């Protein structure tokens, strides 16, 4: 009887140990390491395998010539957002730069992807800054100019209180600064305190940062 009891106890302990081991293994597979702008491949040493977030962004960005109009080289971040480690690294890095925000503003359309992820990470809300005609009225509207023509951005004038809130603008790419500049003006018209902007990619040759000065601008990769 004593022997049988010992065997049963050992069996239960083995089952528990196996379950804990599998759980820990699953947890390790889900981990994303981001530290001071560095990303680690899973299962590799922090000391030997760290690569920069900028390198991750560059490796998963697709250059598309003459899109959406001839003469424009489009930076397609779709592969980056579809990669689980890439998205996790970008989210963590942008969240670090948006720390302290009461609200993040995501710019239509790709800015929505990263803004929502960052807002979730920071446990704050996300405000959708939409292209003209996409929101029910009343709205605040702002026209601006980009590399391939005029455009309009809008936010709701009712239903969302932005006055007095510290807001960080999140977008995928900073080019001439027209989109983020229009977003800033919209938010300030609503009474928000725009603390800065954070983007995944900055096209340094187009002087968007200078156009937005003195607004603090953070980018994960400068191309």
UniProtKB/Swiss-Prot annotation:
Q: Could you tell me which SUPFAM superfamilies the record lists for this protein?
A: PRTase-like
Q: Name one Pfam family in it.
A: Pribosyltran
Q: Which InterPro entries match?
A: Ade_phspho_trans (IPR005764), PRibTrfase_dom (IPR000836), PRTase-like (IPR029057), UPRTase/APRTase (IPR050054)
Q: Kindly state a single biological-process term from the GO annotations of this entry.
A: purine ribonucleoside salvage
Sorted keywords for this record are: Cytoplasm, Glycosyltransferase, Purine salvage, Transferase
- Enumerate the subcellular locations listed in this protein's record, separating them with semicolons: Cytoplasm
So, what pathway does this thing act in?
Answer: Purine metabolism; AMP biosynthesis via salvage pathway; AMP from adenine: step 1/1
Keyword Glycosyltransferase tagged: yes
Reactions listed under catalytic activity: AMP + diphosphate = 5-phospho-alpha-D-ribose 1-diphosphate + adenine
Query: EC number(s)?
Result: 2.4.2.7
A GO cellular component term found in this entry reads: cytoplasm
Q: Which PROSITE patterns match?
A: PUR_PYR_PR_TRANSFER
Per the annotation, which location comes first and is thus the protein's main one?
A: cytoplasm
User: What are this entry's molecular-function GO terms?
Assistant: adenine binding; adenine phosphoribosyltransferase activity; AMP binding
Q: Does the keyword Glycosyltransferase apply?
A: yes
Listed under subunit, the entry gives:
Homodimer.
**NCBIfam families in alphabetical order:** PRK02304.1-5
Q: Which family does it belong to?
A: Belongs to the purine/pyrimidine phosphoribosyltransferase family.
- Cited function: Catalyzes a salvage reaction resulting in the formation of AMP, that is energically less costly than de novo synthesis.
Return the protein name. Answer: Adenine phosphoribosyltransferase
Organism name: Mycobacterium tuberculosis (strain ATCC 25177 / H37Ra)
